[in-house]
Amino acid sequence: MYIQILGSAAGGGFPQWNCNCVNCAGFRDGSLRAHARTQSSIALSDDGINWVLCNASPDIRAQLQGFAPMQPGRALRDTGISAIVLMDSQIDHTTGLLSLREGCPHQVWCTDMVHEDLSTGFPLFEMLKHWNGGLSWNRIELQGSFVIPACPNLRFTPFPLRSAAPPYSPHRFDPHPGDNIGLLVEDTRTGGKLFYAPGLGKVDEALAEKMRDADCLLVDGTMWDDDEMQRRGVGTRTGREMGHLAQNGPGGMLEVLEGFPEPRKVLIHINNTNPILDEDSPERAELARRNVEVAFDGMSIEL
């Protein structure tokens, strides 16, 4: 299985266009050793030719331009994107669909809840019907697994995550299973397994079993501290309130990851306020001590 990190930041990217927190300002003036990051998205393939796009970031055009296999050049109009899987209906995971309109129709896999959000509060399915049929919906059932025909050796097993639906969702304050999902993706030839959950608010025992079964954990790295945005003066809500488990503190992501010594551990969906973006920070050193990696745009993983 080929895994390509197209974007590794949370919503807004890094540096965020309107933010002058210590990270964003430090990056701009050159005092912070860090790398710019686009908004979170990955691509998966079983042959390096046909790719499944997991989430469509607002930065999708730049991301595709930076990854040559996404433009194989086999025809006058072409793309390496064979299907799209949406983990949720958040703006930073779906807005890129608008930029892919010239390539419609697209095969899109998502849950009932996500499809409802994207047909009502943020009606991308309706809007894009005007471009060659738009988006062809394939329902993700939360029981069992599914295979996408373009990548027949990859088996996708979805699981519901405790996180938050977006503000425009009809059930914003009435959570449902399927508002947010994670994926366990297995290459049935190599046996390699990826656990992918860019928005992860809580890890229970059922979820821990899936993580234990994986060779690589690509998980929520949004915040270092739960009250990070409050302390930095850029927000009022905690990480948990937004559906993100912070890395630091009792029961945090680092403590969770300590329970899985075997898999490769990689953080993705990193907010611009997170001190791990500073490559010289003590927090980044703590990750290195724990053998936890920080995803970056253009990172490649093979399982």
UniProtKB/Swiss-Prot annotation:
GO terms for biological process: pyrroloquinoline quinone biosynthetic process. InterPro entries: Metallo-B-lactamas, PQQ_synth_PqqB, RibonucZ/Hydroxyglut_hydro. The keyword Transport applies. CDD domains: PQQB-like_MBL-fold. Signal peptide: none annotated. The keyword Transport applies. Keywords: PQQ biosynthesis, Transport. Gene3D superfamilies: Ribonuclease Z/Hydroxyacylglutathione hydrolase-like (3.60.15.10). SUPFAM superfamilies: Metallo-hydrolase/oxidoreductase (SSF56281). Pathway: Cofactor biosynthesis; pyrroloquinoline quinone biosynthesis. It comes from the Bacteria. Belongs to the PqqB family. May be involved in the transport of PQQ or its precursor to the periplasm. HAMAP family: PQQ_syn_PqqB (MF_00653). This is Coenzyme PQQ synthesis protein B. It comes from Pseudomonas syringae pv. syringae (strain B728a). The gene is pqqB.
